[in-house]
Amino acid sequence: MKPVETENRKVVVVGLGKSGLATARFLLRRGALVTITDQASEARLGDLVVSARDLGATLELGGHQDSTFLSADYIVVSPGVPETLAPLKKAAEKGIPVMGEMELAARFVTKPVAAVTGTNGKTTVTTLLGDMLKASGRQVFVGGNIGAPLIGFADKGENADMAVVEVSSFQLDTSETFRPHVAVLLNIAEDHLARYVDFNAYVRSKGRIFENQEADDVAVINGADFHVLQASKGIRSRKLTFNAGKNTQDGAVIGDTAVEIVTAGTKTATISVTSPLMRARHNMENIAAATLAALAMGATVEGIQAAVDGFQGLRHRLEYVASIDDVHYFDDSKATNPDAVRRALEFFTSRVVLLLGGEDKGCDYGVLKNVIRERARAVVLFGAAKEKIRMAINGSVSLWDAGSMAEAVRRAHELAAPGDAVLLSPACSSFDSYESYAHRGDDFCNAVKKLKEGDHARG
């Protein structure tokens, strides 16, 4: 794969965020003439502007200029920048190359890369896979759509002998030559439909993770997910499956308390799982996928087991917060689509008071109606999408409104019975009221803390 030229090339970087800043740094170090453009104002971007100017980049803020795009040698877009952006379309029509940050990095990375994508579980599997390799004595860069962008590994690749990256559909959309040695596709369910023409376009986007793999590469796929199986049809790499049942020939068989690795029909390793949270079905799938990828990247069984034993899950993912009057509070703010909510509800054996709402992503919330009827005691709705959700799940259980997170938590506590769980698992993005899902989760945790400290506790 031939690296792109950088010396004295005019490069436009679209989006001044963590990815855009890292991209600009990489290019400027290699002699490029970099302009960073962003629709946001200088005041809103704050310290990022200072950092970009310190690097020596030219800045165009508060909007995009067609002339800047049309005079570029090539354009690098940050994750999440839509392909429909007018100046981008004009540049592409003129034949100016447009690529994503990850694609640029792929042109320069020479060490093995494991890439993880899927609608749900990406961050958990990426983190756990990194832990497994580190516990096996490997020097590993972990990043991508989480943490440091892959371009940072291309910039300082000598610090690690391999990379593990989380990859979003947005990043795959702007990649042409990206070839991970190990590609993991966890699951595909409705998400980001406000961006894609239809669900099939989203499925195709996820399947691009396998596009450039060859016979000596490895694909780790969910054998029980119809859309994953469709997306991985006809790929050239060697397939390892998880979640496909006891007849698996090459892959992982998931039990209640362990994951068995099978090679050519023979069991070759067993990974035990002791944590109740990690024994949740979706986390057992995550462990199976991470284990297969780790082995393919050279991890040891001992290192994998040590990583699983020490892994306590990530923040805002079915995270236990507190108990008040025998009602147990869980923060699952990262659940930003209906499938993630379904998985969360299936974890609980008790009744759940569910907090749903936020900014709509174009998903069908009606798929939650049955599982809510089976698992929930009540639902508290909040945020911009609450009326759409109400129409979709009406008739399942009692529905209540809240104007704020604090009100939602108070209402949930009033509705819950002893032994119940109160679960923030919103099925929506957070951007109607919050900077991020983490900001929303922190608000929930703070509301629970105030409830615990205040006068609202019963009895």
From Swiss-Prot:
Record's catalysed reaction(s): UDP-N-acetyl-alpha-D-muramoyl-L-alanine + D-glutamate + ATP = UDP-N-acetyl-alpha-D-muramoyl-L-alanyl-D-glutamate + ADP + phosphate + H(+)
The enzyme's E.C. designation: 6.3.2.9
Pfam families, per database record: Mur_ligase_C (PF02875), Mur_ligase_M (PF08245), MurD-like_N (PF21799)
Gene Ontology annotations for the cellular component aspect, listed alphabetically: cytoplasm
One GO BP annotation of this record: regulation of cell shape
Gene3D superfamilies recorded: Mur ligase, C-terminal domain, Mur-like, catalytic domain, NAD(P)-binding Rossmann-like Domain
Subcellular localization: Cytoplasm
Keyword annotations: ATP-binding, Cell cycle, Cell division, Cell shape, Cell wall biogenesis/degradation, Cytoplasm, Ligase, Nucleotide-binding, Peptidoglycan synthesis
Function statement: Cell wall formation. Catalyzes the addition of glutamate to the nucleotide precursor UDP-N-acetylmuramoyl-L-alanine (UMA).
Protein name: UDP-N-acetylmuramoylalanine--D-glutamate ligase
Gene, per the UniProt record: murD
